[in-house]
Every structure is written in C-alpha cells, then in structure tokens.
A protein has these predicted regions:
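Basic/polar N-terminal segments that are highly enriched at the extreme N-terminus
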Residues: 1-5
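Active-site-adjacent substrate/metal-binding segments within catalytic domains
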Residues: 6-140
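Active-site groove signature of glycoside hydrolases
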Residues: 95-96, 137-153, 157-180
C-alpha cells in the first residue's frame, strides 16, 4: 500500500509529524509543549449498536432513527475545526466506548470486531473515512482495538490475536477499496 502523507515518529522524547516536531517552539504557561501529542478521546467515531434492544437509544431527534454513517459524517465534518484549534490527535476505538459514560452494565453491542476476531467491514469503511480525513489534515489518530464492556464479545485468544493482527496490518487493517 502507498504510504500516507502524514507520518508519525518519535525522536528521543518528542513526537514528530511528517518529520517536524509537534507544536514547534510553543509553550503553555511557561512549559514547553513542543514534541507533545495533545489528543482527545473521541472513541465513538465508528460507533454502531448491533443490539436491537438498545439501538433506539441513540436515534437522532430529527429522523427518529440511529444512523452510524451519519455519526461518522458528523465526526469527519468536525475534524477541521479540531485541527484549526490545535488538536493534532484523537483516540478512536474499534469497540467504541461506553455511550453512557462509565456504565456498569453495557448491553449494547458496539464492537467492530466479530466474535471470531474478524474486523467488521462496515466499521472499517467508517474508520477509513476518518483516517483518510485525518491524513489530509495532518493529524495522527490513535486507534484502540478493545474496550472493556465489549471485549468479552471476542470469543477466545485466537480471536483476539486475529483482531490485533487485522487492526495492525497494512494501513491499520483498513481496506483500500470499498470506501464511501
């Protein structure tokens, strides 16, 4: 696969984006922030709920239904503003995060990973859109694979390995074709 224009590297104790230190020459309240990778946890960019009993909880007020592609569309549309405000990175997760905060019970099924460890194509298409836009903006996303409350949906150690290998493969497991 072709290399992405935005490359992340570590040089001693600082992050580099495309060969340049992040926040070059900048300070905050007298502290050097050059080389840091400021990020925000935005785990729900590829979110969907496969549980019919809980899916309606996330419906949009204007349509009365949940739409995972709209969720990703809105996420992608907001990214330039985040970048303009100085955010260089965000954390996204293939199993999302708890949509209600730190819930004890998580009946929803938000996993982009099937029980056998294969990566769900619809989640990967949404992730590809986010990663492509991040690349265009010169951002370096952090992609998480598992999330507590959803990790039990992956069957066994072999499935865990399959998910990790798929996510860490060429282009982060993101398919080169079939993007929207």
């Amino acid at each position: 696969p072709a290399a992405r224009p935005t490359e992340i590297a570590v040089d001693a104790d600082r992050f580099l984006l495309s060969g340049k230190p992040t926040y070059a020459g900048r300070t905050y309240k007298g502290l050097k922030i050059e080389g840091l990778l400021l990020n925000s946890r935005m785990a729900q960019g590829v979110f969907d709920d496969r549980n019919p009993d809980t899916r309606a909880k996330w419906r949009y007020p204007d349509t009365g239904r949940w739409d995972p592609d709209r969720n990703t569309d809105e996420f992608v549309a907001a990214m330039p503003e985040w970048r303009q405000c100085g955010l260089l990175s965000f954390t996204i997760n293939l199993q999302g995060g708890s949509p209600e905060g730190y819930s004890k019970s998580q009946p929803w099924d938000t996993s982009g990973i099937a029980a056998n460890g294969s990566l769900r194509a619809d989640y990967m298409r949404r992730l590809a859109r986010i990663l492509d836009r991040a690349d265009e903006l010169g951002m370096a996303p952090i992609v998480g694979v598992f999330y507590f409350g959803q990790d039990q949906r992956v069957r066994n150690e072999a499935a865990v390995r399959r998910a990790v290998e798929g996510a860490a493969g060429p282009r982060g497991g993101v398919p080169a074709a079939g993007r929207r």
